[in-house]
Amino acid sequence: MYAVKEVKGMDGVFIMNNSLLTINPNPGVKVYGERIIDWGGREYRVWDPRRSKLAAAILNGLRGFSLNSDSRVLYLGASAGTTASHISDIVTDGRVYCIEFSPRMMRELLGVCESRKNMAPLLEDASRPLSYLRMVEAADLVYCDVAQPDQTRLFIENMDCFLKRDGYGLIMIKARSIDVTRSPRKIFREEVGKLESSGFRIIDQVGLNPYEKDHMAVLVKRDV
């Protein structure tokens, strides 16, 4: 018989039969057509690793950080809000600042945020953090999922602006967005080197296969 259990070291993240789950704050409401599970008097949303790189990273063993109910998260590249909605489930008394540059994606994101008071959608360019400096609190986690060649640079700049001294940064490095002609392994090594040379310590890193090809999740913290 299957049971819902909390993932070790991951507050607010649960697992049942190899499926990740988060508690649904709006019972009966789906965000992206995800499955719903009722267990022990609670409703859970299935966190699809093929729709969310963070779910893929956790299933592949990423550890070393945990969000609390009152955590502040800066999400760079929130898109339509799939992953951000699950983070919202976890940080129930916190805040998820969702940076998205595409007006089309922002329209979808706004629909998700309407029923989630802890999500703040911002139509901004993640490569220009000073433009939203006064709108975002200091963050416990800066999460980056953008398909740009300079993704590591903008990730570092946002951490320099917003990351708390004891906070964490998590980037989903997309090798093919940086250079389609070169080995992903070499690209990952170079991007990790950029993070280290900018004063960040690597806490963990995992590939996202089989859910995402040529992607790596890299978790960092200030090297102080």
UniProtKB/Swiss-Prot annotation:
UniProt record, GO biological process: box C/D sno(s)RNA 3'-end processing; tRNA processing
MF terms in GO: histone H2AQ104 methyltransferase activity; RNA binding; rRNA methyltransferase activity
Gene3D superfamilies: Phosphorylase Kinase, domain 1, Vaccinia Virus protein VP39
Keyword terms of this UniProt record: Methyltransferase, RNA-binding, rRNA processing, Transferase, tRNA processing
Binding site for S-adenosyl-L-methionine: T82, T83, E100, F101, D125, A126, D145, V146, A147, Q148
Record EC number: 2.1.1.-
UniProt KW rRNA processing keyword: yes
Alphabetical list of PANTHER family matching this protein: FIBRILLARIN, RRNA 2-O-METHYLTRANSFERASE FIBRILLARIN
Assembly information from the UniProt record: Interacts with nop5. Component of box C/D small ribonucleoprotein (sRNP) particles that contain rpl7ae, FlpA and nop5, plus a guide RNA.
Family according to the record: Belongs to the methyltransferase superfamily. Fibrillarin family.
Biological function: Involved in pre-rRNA and tRNA processing. Utilizes the methyl donor S-adenosyl-L-methionine to catalyze the site-specific 2'-hydroxyl methylation of ribose moieties in rRNA and tRNA. Site specificity is provided by a guide RNA that base pairs with the substrate. Methylation occurs at a characteristic distance from the sequence involved in base pairing with the guide RNA.
The protein, known as: Fibrillarin-like rRNA/tRNA 2'-O-methyltransferase
Organism: Methanothermobacter thermautotrophicus (strain ATCC 29096 / DSM 1053 / JCM 10044 / NBRC 100330 / Delta H)
